[in-house]
Amino acid sequence: MTKKIFLTALCALALCPAFAQTSGTEEKVEYSTDKYKVETNSFWDNTFVSLGVGGNIYFGDHDKQVDFGKRLAPAFDIAVGKWFTPGIGVRVMYNYLKSKGATQDVISTPAHSTGEPVPGKDGWGQYLRYSKFNMGNLHADVMFNVLHLFGDNNLNCKWDLSPYVGIGWAHVYDSPKKSSVSGNFGLLGSYNINETWAVNADLRGVLLSDGLDGEKGARAEGDLSFTS
């Protein structure tokens, strides 16, 4: 009897590690389909870098006196960002803008004047000259991908449409140098070629304080740009 009990106990001890190993390797994986839920993951997951080139128009005190074609100037941008959910993301973007317009030649050194008179606008009471200057705008935006927020949450969708709002800091690099808080808003459209590459089209408006172009007026200033 004692010998049988000993053999039974020995068999039980031998089987214990096998049961422990089996239970220790069992893994349960859950996938969330909640498009509003923020998942904790690696910092680099769902991050992106974007580059853009296009055109912009500045809205200053006298710029409307210049034809549209003469006000159109180059715009460049670079951004880094991250999508926390399929519908909500953030980015930090820098825009380099060349601005063209008009300034009033009533002081010894008109703001950003090229010295060239605006045809038909350089007579008595106007004294307008063409102007141009370079500026930068660094801003942080919150983006909302409406096709995922209000759609069927299809992560394989080729198209994304993301309105955004943000705040930043704009600075004119040419004398007279000026700076301003910038309010940024716009619409970003994307076509996803594959999981790595996408083509973007970004229509962006910027609200700026009066005087950034070197002239004080009665209202705020702004910029409208399109890059892709």
Model-found features: residue ranges?
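Short glycine/proline- and aromatic-enriched beta-strand/turn motifs that initiate or cap beta-hairpins
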Residues: 21-81, 174
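Residues on the lipid-exposed face of transmembrane beta-strands in outer-membrane beta-barrel proteins
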Residues: 51-55, 78-82, 92, 140-146, ...
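Extracellular loop and loop/strand-boundary signature of outer-membrane beta-barrel proteins
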Residues: 37, 61-66, 123-131, 171-175, ...
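Predominantly the C-terminal beta-signal and adjacent terminal strand-loop region
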Residues: 99-105, 196-228
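Bacterial Sec-dependent N-terminal signal peptides
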Residues: 1-27
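Short loop/turn motifs that connect adjacent beta-strands in outer-membrane beta-barrel proteins
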Residues: 36-46, 87, 148-160, 193-196
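Residues that define the transmembrane beta-barrel architecture of outer-membrane proteins
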Residues: 45, 68-76, 134-138, 157-159, ...
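Gram-negative (and chloroplast) outer-membrane scaffold detector with strong preference
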Residues: 86-181
